[in-house]
Swiss-Prot record:
This is Nicotinate-nucleotide--dimethylbenzimidazole phosphoribosyltransferase. The gene is cobT. InterPro entries: Nict_dMeBzImd_PRibTrfase, Nict_dMeBzImd_PRibTrfase_bact, Nict_dMeBzImd_PRibTrfase_N, Nict_dMeBzImd_PRibTrfase_sf. Its EC number is 2.4.2.21. Signal peptide: none annotated. It comes from Pseudomonas entomophila (strain L48).
Amino acid sequence: MTQMWWRDACQPLDTAAMDQARARQQQLTKPTGSLGQLEGLAIRLAGLQGRERPTVEQVAITIFAGDHGVVEEGISAYPQAVTGQMLRNFVSGGAAISVLARQLEASLEVVDLGTVDPSLDLPGVRHLRLGAGTGNFARQAAMTDAQLAAALQAGRDSALRALERGAQLFIGGEMGIGNTTAAAALACTLMGCPARELSGPGTGLDSAGVRHKAEVIERALVLHGLRADEPLRALGHVGGFEIAALVGAYLACAQHGLAVLVDGFICSVAALVAVRLNPQCQPWLLFAHQGAEPGHKALLAALHAEPLLALGLRLGEGSGAALAVPLIRLACALHGQMATFAEAAVADRPA
């Protein structure tokens, strides 16, 4: 690939705004540190937005969808037709993320990168059709170089559209039957873990199904000879269209100064790929929750991430990130609207 835009510099955090926010936190009518993670969250958002009192009113959600050839190996509890059917559900308003987006008054964009139904043509969906799903990575590379570049660019384009709409926070979601297998294969490569440690039930596999899934991943890793220091090659060989688009979106957000709220296991794997491709993007990634997939805890630890929630979620779609938005908004409201000791005429703790 000649156009490696993902290596471009990311925006720095505004340390002066963070210092101002930190000083404000120490003046608010509460014991310092008593609001726990919410205090650090407000301070970090101040650095990301370049203002002492950040707000998160404008939220952009993009769902990236794509099918996976590795489903041929019997690694999913659901048929591939569900991917296309869920695209219809997203835009008709019946999916979980559709409901959450309405409640949050967030924009919702749906991008079809390539499903097994090439005739799919849904109003309200951006159909890019990079292929009828990825190749079966148990037997061949998941993507060609051209497909990988196009998927990364699709994510970048979505992030730029969010910026044009005035977004203050970007949430990427995903849909693709078989994508926990692709995500686990990527994570195993980048973290150097055996597949059995990172393979989970996904949409509902039983214990035998999970063992088979791990075996498929292990065989694929041997086939492709992937290395932890080659994240782009790993993404192309065992990733997915939607995972690559998430990577592109996260990197573009960091390069253009838009905070990202990362969803669950699959999105966290995309975040790990993004960080390995361009470590400067890491400060721009906030992590919404620790999900039910057994590998998510280790993945978050590898990212040095402190998730906001732990609700046992395993839906995907960006739903866990959307659920964390009210908490972020409240953290900003507390930071911006609480009185200082001086304003409230309340005695502060003696120095």
